Amino acid sequence: MLIPFTKYQGAGNDFILCNQWESEPLTRRDTDLLARLCDRRFGIGADGVMFLRKHADYDFEMVYFNADGREGSMCGNGGRCIVAFAYHLGLIAEQTHFLAVDGPHAARVIRSDWVELGMQQVAEVEQGDGFFFLDTGSPHYVTLVDDLSQVDVVRQGRAIRYGDRFREKGTNVNFVQRQGPALTIGTYERGVEDETLACGTGITAAALVSSFLPQGQPAKQDYAVPVRAKGGDLEVRFAWDGERFTDIWLCGPATRVFSGEIEI
């Protein structure tokens, strides 16, 4: 059977997108097949797979799978890419609302290759000894470093992800360097089990964490934080109302790479 697909990338975070608007040839049970599609030597190659599906109450539903073939938590760059995909298919307008695993999301297509994604509010941020831990749709461990170029993201990230605290469920691990108002980030992603060129929920987590510095508590104001990942530049906009982070937007590129068919 031939399965049509389209490949998208958001700042180098790449995804296989399957239009399941009318039929569902692939399902959540196809774990091994989905993992094989993500394999960069024996498949198409990607950080994850997404199904675009109809939904009765939203413009569409996003179903996301990690590169290991298992259904994953929210993927920020994936969310931006699937919005671009649906827009290019003519299924949605520039302003849209869709459903993901962590709940509803708003999004807007600013231009054909730039999408802004509304993220869930964040109320709980753990401040540990040299790290922050928070959930921006996916769990993220964030630690600040003086020189990101000296960090072995894979080795150090894997040690934290498989450490005693996170061994059972795992976590994404982010190493963040501040450079004035901007951030540079390296992320080890759970489910991919490797460093990725960008991680949208990790970039969001890093931007929120940056508002704690240097005073130790965010100010009641609007923020716009530029973040540079290995795969490109993004921006996170948000506000702090004294109790939680609100009006969070992950803004960045979402670009079609190619379309094709693969036999399964």
Name these PLM-found stretches.
Residues 134:
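Short glycine/Trp-rich loop-beta-loop segment that forms part of the substrate-binding cleft
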